[in-house]
């Protein structure tokens, strides 16, 4: 397990401290709403932020399982994602690190106190993606993502907690 190497002030005063804050392994719970007050799906899993080869780079690797809450109940759906976070002088740029869009920009954020706020919208076809991070404590944060378009009204709430030495999260394909 990768743990945070440097203890920094909270909230992180700058982007270098923010990179140190994110470094390590986290577990998450996620709730997904699509156009209604009732959640359509939940997900659980783990993600790691590890140092990349470029100064100011963290690589994000997420693994988890998704459960539909209505209609398509059954076995969990396993998923994974990779992103490339670049901590620059004034913003955090997030690039795709898997799939057909490797290296292309996904989101860009500004640090405002205990929040990372979008520096710009991310347009994917007719859909607009926006997310904001709230740094809740030294060892937890939330990320709320909105996806809006002609056929989408999606809200995704991710609650992340740092994994400690006593916590070894598991992501398995067995039903809960």
Locations of regions flagged by a protein language model:
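Soluble ligand-binding/transfer domains with enclosed cavities or grooves
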Residues: 3-176
């Amino acid at each position: 397990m990768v743990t945070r190497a440097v203890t920094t002030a909270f909230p992180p005063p700058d982007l270098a401290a923010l990179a140190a804050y994110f470094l390590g392994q986290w577990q998450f719970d996620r709730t997904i709403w699509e156009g209604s007050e009732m959640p359509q799906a939940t997900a659980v899993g783990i993600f790691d932020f590890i140092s990349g080869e470029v100064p100011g780079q963290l690589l994000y690797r997420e693994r988890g399982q998704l459960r539909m809450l209505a209609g398509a109940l059954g076995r969990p759906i396993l998923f994974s994602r990779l992103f490339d976070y670049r901590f620059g002088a004034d913003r955090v740029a997030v690039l795709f690190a898997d799939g057909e869009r490797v290296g292309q920009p996904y989101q860009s954020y500004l640090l405002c106190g205990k929040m990372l706020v979008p520096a710009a919208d991310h347009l994917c076809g007719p859909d607009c993606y926006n997310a904001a991070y709230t740094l809740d404590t030294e060892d937890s944060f939330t990320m709320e993502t909105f996806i809006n378009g002609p056929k989408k009204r999606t809200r995704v709430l991710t609650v992340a907690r740092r994994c400690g030495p006593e916590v070894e999260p598991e992501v398995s394909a067995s039903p809960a």
